[in-house]
Amino acid sequence: MKVYLHSPVYSLGDTAYGVEESALASRTLSSADKLREAGFETHHVCSPDTGVQDLAARTATQLGECLDTVSTVVFSTCLPMNGSVGSFADFQESRDVKHLMDFPASRLQAACGLQDTQIIGLNQQACTGMLGGIRLAKALLQAETDVDDILCITADRFPPNAIYEQSYNLISDGAAAVVVSRIERGFRVVGCHQITNGALVQASDDEAVGTYFNYTHRLVQESLAKIHGTISDIDWIIAQNMNVKAWQILARLLAFDSERVYFDSLPEVGHVISGDNVINLKKLDDSDAIRPGEKLLMLMAGYGMNWQSVILEKV
């Protein structure tokens, strides 16, 4: 059974800051010059009263009538704290753990009028959670005939006073979503793959960077092997937003044209936790640069350590 993905949408934190402003405010570890050299210009930070449920609702409502056919929501969060919007202070006062189970997916269901939907929460996959959600949605549609369209959504915000830099990448709060369906529209989901190395769960920034190239190269080769393909079958790589030099190196390792590695949203939005692939997919698709039949490889690395991929084909 073929499964498709369509309607990528996203939203960002309330306030945009330039790298100079955030460096001066100690929101970053690297200097503004270093961040600019890596390709970053601005990032987006939520106001204190904006929660992940707000980011998710802002994103999902952009889908309009597409929500009418959604039967299941797969809601992924990178930070475990974003898996509940309840008050820890209320728990401490009452000692009642219900305050720790105020799930943003349930809030989203109510806010968007998705009364008859099933809810699945996905975490412990860090920045790869969105691609993991797409993989799960594909498997559900192929395994359960009574499941209709699936909303895959991710939303995360850093806590107040957090450092908005990880592994030398400038972070933005934000959310992103796609609809996964049996209806032929947008892109066919050709294949999905995941690698996890739990021994690296507490990897430092330098260790994360050091393992990135080896594991991402392995991820690409194993992903292509699963669909009996080679790198020459891929027309575009839809990348995560990270240091531009890293992608130049990786493209050479993969023997892939670096001009076909797309992460043009990087200067404007930074690294939007689990949302980069969706944001870049939307921007590239909106440009009409993708031709029917072309294959796209979406890649993401995340703490845990996790690496995930999704291969798409434009319909």
Residue ranges of predicted features:
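Conserved beta-strand elements of the Class I
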Residues: Y4, S71-V74, D149-L151, D235, ...
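Acidic, glycine-rich active-site loops and adjacent beta-strand->loop/helix elements
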Residues: S76-M81, Q124-T128, T154-P159, M300-M305
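Glycine-rich phosphate-binding loops at beta-strand->alpha-helix junctions
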Residues: I237-A246, V269-V272
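Catalytic phosphate/nucleotide-handling subdomain of diverse soluble enzymes
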Residues: L284-P292, I311-V315
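Condensing-enzyme catalytic core mediating Claisen C-C bond formation in acyl metabolism
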Residues: M1-D49, A162-E222, K226, A301, ...
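Phosphate/pyrophosphate-binding loops at sites that engage ATP/ADP/AMP, CoA/4′-phosphopantetheine
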Residues: A56-S71, R218-D235, L254, L284-A289
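Flexible, glycine-rich active-site loops centered on histidine and acidic residues
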Residues: Q142, V147, I153-G174
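Conserved catalytic cysteine-centered active-site region
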Residues: T28, A32-Q53, P80-L136, L140-D148, ...
